[in-house]
Amino acid sequence: MLRIGLTGGIGSGKSTVANYFAELGAPVIDADQIAHEITKPDQAAFKQIINHFGNAVLTKGKFLNRTKLRELIFENPDDRQWLENLLHPLIIAKMKTQLKKIKAPYCILAIPLLAEASQSVDFIDRILVVDAPETLQIQRTKSRDQLSDQQIQLILQSQSPREKRLAIADDVIVNDQTIPILRKAVFQLHCKYLQIAQT
């Protein structure tokens, strides 16, 4: 089975692209979704996060306040590194487990921080980068997440620069046009991946 790593900066449209691949029948394993699962209150990582950050990152219902946690880690690079060191190996292990259960010509592994962690993600055959101009990234993120300009800039600065992402790419979708154009680009890659998977 061909394993495609899907990545891109915040607001690039990688989730939309992953959804389009899923609509075409490709299995999608999503690192963000796994991160949500492993940080639920009954998981070991949840307890470690609370021990490290304290009750400030809890909601009234005793769940993880992801907005508050995001604010803290983007203001403090050491905390961000600590959290990535905790979650990254757990996410990779879950991805590998899920991969074993999939029977398909190819599958999509949606990993936002793939450029930052490409050395430790050694089970990917090709890398697909969803790229967009920074102005569009900011615009999309503002309308979706209601973050301030300063928060968005901090997130952008914490991610690999576009050049680094593009340097590791085998395939690139530039997402700066209309939805039909984006769908067409995904369909073309879908056909390409099916073809590669057969060889």
From Swiss-Prot:
Location (main, coarse): cytoplasm
Signal sequence, start to end: none
Keyword Magnesium: no
Pathway: Cofactor biosynthesis; coenzyme A biosynthesis; CoA from (R)-pantothenate: step 5/5
Any one of the GO CC terms: cytoplasm
Role description: Catalyzes the phosphorylation of the 3'-hydroxyl group of dephosphocoenzyme A to form coenzyme A.
Designated name of the protein: Dephospho-CoA kinase
Source organism phylogeny: Bacteria, Pseudomonadati, Pseudomonadota, Gammaproteobacteria, Legionellales
Primary gene name: coaE
